[in-house]
Amino acid sequence: MPNFIMMTKKSLLLAICLTTALCAMAKGNENQQLMDFGWQFIQNGKTVTVDLPHDWDIYVGPNSGKGATGTGGGWFEGGKGEYRKTFATPKGERVKLLFEGVYQHAEVFINGQKAGQHAYGYTPFTVDITPYLHHDKRQNEVVVKVDNSAQPNCRWYSGSGIYRHVWMLTMNDLHIAENGVFVTTPDVTADKAQVCVEVTVANESDRDRNVTVAVGAAQLMASVKAHDTKTVATTFFVKNPKLWSPESPELYETTAELKEAGAVVDRQTTKYGIRSFSFDAEQGFVLNGKKVLLNGACVHHDDGALGAMAFDAAEIRKVRQMKNAGFNLIRTSHNPTTRAFLDACDSIGMLVIDEAFDGWRTQKNPYDYSTVIDSCFREDLHAMVMRDRNHPSIISWSIGNEVIERKDIRVIYTARQMKAAIHEKDTTRPVTEALCAWDRDWEIYDPHAEVLDVVGYNYMIFKHASDHQRDPKRVMWQTESYPRDAFNNWAVANDNPYVVGDMVWTGLDYLGESSIGRYYYKGEREGESWTEGGFPEWHGACCGDVDITGWRKPISHYRDMLWNADEANSSLYMAVCEPDGYVGEVKLTMWGVWPTWESWTWRGWEGKPINVEVYTKSPEVKLYLNDQLVGTKQVSRDTKFKAVFNVNYQPGTLRAEAGGKSVVLSTAGEPARLRLTTDRRTIAADGQDLAFITVEVVDDKGNICPEAAIPCDISVSGAGKFMSAVSADLKDIEPYTSTRVKTWKGRAMIVVRSSRKAGQTKVSVKSSLPTASISIAQK
């Protein structure tokens, strides 16, 4: 029985106490070297020098209606590519290459000999290259062949290439195993926490070895046979522990030393966080003794304008965007994320459902994971769990999403197999899966749901009451929901402890699943993204609470208020609904919400009615137009915490007041200039850091001009280099790596990458308006 579960056949009580670690593979570890720089990329007979992370698809741009990845992949091409790099043989008895992610079907060759391969594009893998290295003065060559030509193989934008980091690991034959430190806390109170540390020692030599593992004051003796491993464990206590939580993400660290004959042969320092949590149908989700409602978002792996290229700075920014939007939970849909993303969740304070797969044995696309599942699923689950099990942010493992074969009894066997594979490496977290029904036959899932510790509901939470009556011990969370149902989903979780939370689809706009979330106008083509032929003019999904430039949509502010505000201390936000007929008669798709904007600029609509929405939990809202009272509205749960005013539009100033706060929207004048702002004025001169620069079209008073669509030309000089540019218009087919971008709704974004030298980077943007510039320091 897993150590976090006390259960009978029909009951569930999860009591989970764990502490976890940020992986010891931090930059600067003496046993590793970043291998991201100076690769030769070969494709279609052409060779260029590239630095990793690298995604060749994003450099070409969408080929609307024609790209091999289809509407699901955003009309990009996929294909094949080859990466080459030379290097000197490093010191060390054993040398390995760690690939954090290659999409997909990677083959690794060292000096012409095949050293390893890996099929799945989202899990890390390590290749021992020791037997293939030169041991004289000759340079070695690594070749990585990537095959993403079998299309379509993914329901969203995957990217193509070595899109995550590569590391060279050097070690003695006797060493702490990769991901070989595991930290848990079986007992946590406010006064004291019990911390258990397991250390796995690997002996890759031809003789038995006697070793000592030191963790704090503990000295653990062990004998490790040749070509074998041995795990030792110790326990210590932390008095008055500072508990990890989203509000207070406290981290500790401990060091494990491996010694032989008194000499230290390996050392690993691990950051960890202490906290306890439980899931229960009567109490809900309890973290450190307090009930917490889970306000979650599903997030894909792409980084928008960067495609799949997983820079640490972009991953951190993504987590921070979700934190700033009021979320406390992310579901990594539908694949393992990056180490940097999870490190950010640990340090910023964000709970995580770590998801392994989209589908299983029945294909969703002709060349998806179903083609390799039987030979790969245990390896891939182990890779995910071993790498991630020390992260305090992770509260659940997810084994799948909307599997097609749900009516086949064998699906229960598959779920059990996957759960067992996870438990081989970690029993401290519940296993979940996102279930969905495309017909009325929902109850057929009951035997499948029995396998799961927490049951994921995709768009099916309206079944919660009848399911609870049928199975009162079942713990549920809605693993996907429609953005438009924000209030109802909050209410269900707020009122029913057995429903522990909700995850909207999605937190961020993303590439692929082209046109999901769109609104359109009468006379335009109807249908959803999967309509035959797709919507070739689209290459991304606009269902996110935050758009691809990082701007929070009004639905984001509304959701944040629902989950995080109360009457005594409520946020206040005002937005304006696009009038029906302003452009055309508005039509919505399933994931769409009414086009609503932070704008009081509606030229040509003077004297006509327009709806103004104010979001707050304060009991009363007053609205003023040009300092004249328009009206007063009462706000309560009955009004879904919205005050809606119907106002005849006049240019000027619109002001809402509630709870001692006020918010103002002003009519914008003609575009006067470009305003550039950056998320950071100083970035690291390590060749890996990024600055995200927002471009806004403003009038002479600094108001954003929401209808401005102005072509801009970008130049970057100095220490850094241009990476990409983007607007939130997911119908714009300009390649993201082009130095030309057109603002949409008055906004665009530029991404600059650092070099490995100190200095200043100047970013200039030319347009029909005066040229705007901004400088960023590299240190």
Where are these regions (language model features)?
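Substrate-binding/catalytic cleft of secreted carbohydrate-active enzymes
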Residues: 313-566, 571-575, 586-590, 596-601
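Accessory carbohydrate-binding/adhesion or oligomerization-edge regions at the termini
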Residues: 27-68, 86, 143-145, 515, ...
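Accessory beta-strand-rich segments of carbohydrate-active enzymes
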Residues: 37, 42, 78-178, 204-205, ...
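Extended carbohydrate-recognition surfaces in non-catalytic/accessory domains of CAZymes
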Residues: 27-98, 150, 154-162, 174, ...
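Extended acidic/polar, glycine-enriched regions
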Residues: 134-137, 198-280, 648-651, 665-669
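An acidic-aromatic loop/edge-strand motif
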Residues: 35-37, 53-73, 120-121, 131-197, ...
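Beta-strand-rich structural segments
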Residues: 197-201, 254-257, 592-598, 612-615, ...
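Active-site-adjacent substrate/metal-binding segments within catalytic domains
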Residues: 60-86, 93-110, 116-119, 169, ...
